[in-house]
């Protein structure tokens, strides 16, 4: 079976995309604009560079009164050029889900989900105190893919500071068991990172050169 995006309804291809690109890590993004706190999860998310350290996530456009409009997260980042990406653990899954609603921009999702703010060091938006790892980011660039919903934009931010809770560190490294991260599947399904296995990378010898044979 071969499928071309233009040959089937958008929703059908969307289901194929989200069911096969999974599990996806979740960026729980906190922003601040004109005194209003905003917090929302995005599963089109990943690390995109190690040096300089960059994270990227993709919020989609939405319809407001019949007009195309950016989500509050994207609007706030365009205005302030700062945001925080908080990781999502199993313990806060319900709170994360509660913040995913399409609320009015005046709604404080921290208060709605009964979450605690933790001051950031180098950016204005606060962190989610219940999240054990929070990345403070400065906007690097935004790439827009369209002007009509559900087109998205790729937001890339440079990490300027990262907060790590001591209770998820073991011998100076992040411990996956203590982190207990979750990932997004399709529909209402999520996955938990408790069933893991190890694979060692293959050892590949460099090819011989005339210089190395001497």
Give the ranges of each region predicted by the language model.
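Basic, polyanion-binding surface patches
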Residues: 1-214
């Amino acid at each position: 079976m071969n499928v071309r995006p233009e040959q089937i309804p958008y929703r059908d291809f969307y289901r194929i995309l989200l069911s096969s690109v999974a599990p996806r890590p979740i960026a729980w993004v906190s922003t601040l604009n004109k005194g209003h706190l905003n917090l929302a999860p995005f599963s089109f998310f990943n690390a995109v560079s190690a040096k300089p350290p960059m994270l990227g996530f993709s919020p989609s456009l939405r319809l407001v009164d019949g007009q195309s409009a950016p989500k509050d997260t994207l609007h706030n980042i365009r205005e302030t050029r700062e945001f925080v990406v908080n990781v999502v653990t199993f313990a806060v899954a319900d709170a994360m889900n509660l913040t995913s609603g399409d609320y009015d921009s005046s709604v404080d999702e921290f208060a709605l989900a009964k979450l605690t703010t933790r001051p950031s060091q180098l950016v204005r938006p606060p962190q989610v105190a219940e999240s054990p790892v929070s990345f403070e980011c400065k906007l690097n660039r935004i790439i827009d893919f369209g002007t009509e919903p559900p087109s998205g934009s790729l937001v890339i931010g440079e990490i300027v500071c990262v907060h790590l809770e001591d209770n998820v560190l073991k011998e100076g490294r992040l411990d996956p068991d203590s982190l207990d991260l979750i990932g997004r599947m399709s529909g209402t399904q999520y996955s938990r990172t408790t069933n893991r296995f190890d694979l060692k990378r293959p050892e590949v010898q460099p090819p011989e050169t005339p210089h190395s044979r001497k």
